[in-house]
């Protein structure tokens, strides 16, 4: 068994001023690795408190790039993935909120390629993930690997998230 670090795409919907509901990761193949639903479900506790940065970085992270934090991770049976609330905060919070609003307004445009990507450490072998060890970050990026996108804006409707 080997340990691997990987960045994976996410999906998101706004649920209030500065808050977004995101689909952090779903079961399936990404970057040559298969992520089984059971492994993702077991990783739920690792997602709470994970920071969101603007852009991935190969260097040490800067506090200037903090855009938010993940809260309330739950298992979403219908999408076979981890769902969580992303709360905007930090020096780059306005970037997150502004881009989210703009992408949601232009959601029908094929040219919009901004979304989220998870930077994770896992154990696996033969192309199959066996255990997620750590979530380093969930980052706002251009052209995420699995096409993570903003889904819809609920904050304009005053809808609060429902976690079943």
List PLM regions with ranges.
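Polar/acidic, low-complexity leader/linker segments enriched in S/T/G and N/D
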Residues: 1-51, 160-163
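Short coil-to-beta-strand transition motifs
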Residues: 62-65, 132
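Short conserved beta-strand and strand-loop elements enriched in small hydrophobics
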Residues: 48-62, 73
């Amino acid at each position: 068994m080997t340990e691997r670090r990987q960045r994976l795409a996410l999906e998101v919907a706004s649920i209030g001023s500065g808050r977004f509901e995101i689909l952090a990761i779903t079961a399936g193949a990404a970057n040559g690795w298969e992520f089984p639903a059971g492994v993702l479900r077991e990783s739920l506790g690792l997602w709470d408190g994970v920071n969101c940065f603007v852009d991935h970085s190969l260097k040490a992270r800067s506090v200037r790039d903090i855009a938010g934090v993940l809260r309330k991770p739950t298992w979403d049976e219908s999408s076979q993935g981890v769902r969580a609330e992303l709360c905007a905060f930090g020096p780059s919070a306005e970037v997150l909120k502004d881009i989210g609003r703009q992408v949601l307004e232009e959601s029908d445009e094929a040219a919009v390629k901004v979304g989220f990507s998870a930077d994770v450490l896992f154990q696996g072998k033969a192309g199959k993930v066996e255990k997620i060890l750590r979530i380093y970050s969930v980052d706002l990026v251009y052209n995420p690997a699995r096409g993570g996108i903003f889904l819809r804006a609920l904050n304009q409707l005053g809808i609060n998230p429902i976690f079943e």
